[in-house]
């Protein structure tokens, strides 16, 4: 399995440089933040991580009203790069951050 390297879009910090995680479909950040229910939500591709220590440089926000937390670059504090789902203990990093 190859490595995945994600660099912050706003500064030169490496956010993730580790084994390529599994890709899963989860609700988009917009849908997750604005929906009352979890039914029929628009989805997006995310890299799934269970261990916060797999990241090189990420910060996690305080819980939002729906108990999700946003992921951001720990150096420049810009994001969101994805979100943390505390109910399922999933750190979800946007696949769109990968540069081809």
Curated annotation (Swiss-Prot):
- The residues covered by the MSS4 domain are 1-100
| Gene Ontology biological process terms, A to Z | post-Golgi vesicle-mediated transport; protein transport; small GTPase-mediated signal transduction
Q: Drop me one GO molecular function for this one.
A: guanyl-nucleotide exchange factor activity
Q: State the species of origin.
A: Schizosaccharomyces pombe (strain 972 / ATCC 24843) (Fission yeast)
Alphabetized InterPro entries for the sequence: Mss4, Mss4-like_sf, Mss4/transl-control_tumour
- Name the protein family: Belongs to the DSS4/MSS4 family.
Name of the protein in its database record: Guanine nucleotide exchange factor MSS4 homolog
CDD domains according to UniProt: RabGEF (cd00246)
Q: Does the keyword Cytoplasm apply?
A: no
**Annotated Gene3D superfamilies:** Metal Binding Protein, Guanine Nucleotide Exchange Factor, Chain A
Binding annotation for Zn(2+): 8, 11, 73, 76
Top-level taxonomic group: Eukaryota
Q: Which residues form a coiled coil?
A: none
Q: What does this chain do? A: Guanine-nucleotide-releasing protein that acts on members of the sec4/ypt1/rab subfamily.
User: Which terms in the GO cellular component ontology are assigned?
Assistant: cytosol; membrane
Keyword list (alphabetical) reads: Guanine-nucleotide releasing factor, Metal-binding, Protein transport, Transport, Zinc
